Amino acid sequence: MNNLKQGKFITFEGGEGIGKSTQSQMLYEYLQSQNTPVILTREVGGTIVAEKMREILVHEELLPMSELLQAIAARYDHMARKIIPALQEGHIVICDRFIDSTACYQGLELENGIDLVYNLHKTLMPSLMPDITFFIDVEPDTAIKRVNSRNMSNKFDIRGIDFYKKIYDCFKELSNRFPERIKTIKASDLSPLEVHELIKKHL
């Protein structure tokens, strides 16, 4: 853990419809029940400014570089105003999406974009990476069925199966690239409670 931090930083990653938000909430409630100082947040968003940026990012069609820089700007505000102060106070911070989502959703749209995402992060925010990341591994065919069954949507939800497969393959690649940090939870055939129990074993 970086010397800047006293708490622990946990992130949840994966494509659309895979249960990240559910697992983030379940872990948050579990840690609260253990009287553990914990906060739950999300990206893109987490602060008033970043949530306004989120509305543009998830609903408007931006140029690829504009979209990446919007995500990075929102993250900088989120980290400075919320994540870093909470970690310095000794809290566990649970974040629904972080840098790996930026790599897959925005980085893939640019030449050498994945490396660019991590290099930008190291330049602008060198002091903070997650201590542990849970990649919720749900097959794209299953994920898109889940998304199609719900009423709410954004521009990423309504893209086709080829997009879902591309994002899935990207997260698989990142889990191989950062095996010490990213823990893969195979969840296609598991209930939310079963997934939650697997996650707890890594804490």
From Swiss-Prot:
One GO CC term, this protein: cytosol
Gene Ontology biological process: dTDP biosynthetic process; dTTP biosynthetic process; dUDP biosynthetic process
EC top class, as a word: transferase
Binding-site residues for ATP, renumbered to this chain: G14, G15, E16, G17, I18, G19, K20, S21
Enzyme Commission designation: 2.7.4.9
Function: Phosphorylation of dTMP to form dTDP in both de novo and salvage pathways of dTTP synthesis.
Family as reported in the entry's similarity comment: Belongs to the thymidylate kinase family.
Name the UniProt record assigns to this protein: Thymidylate kinase
Species of origin: Rickettsia massiliae (strain Mtu5)
Organism placement in taxonomy: Bacteria, Pseudomonadati, Pseudomonadota, Alphaproteobacteria, Rickettsiales
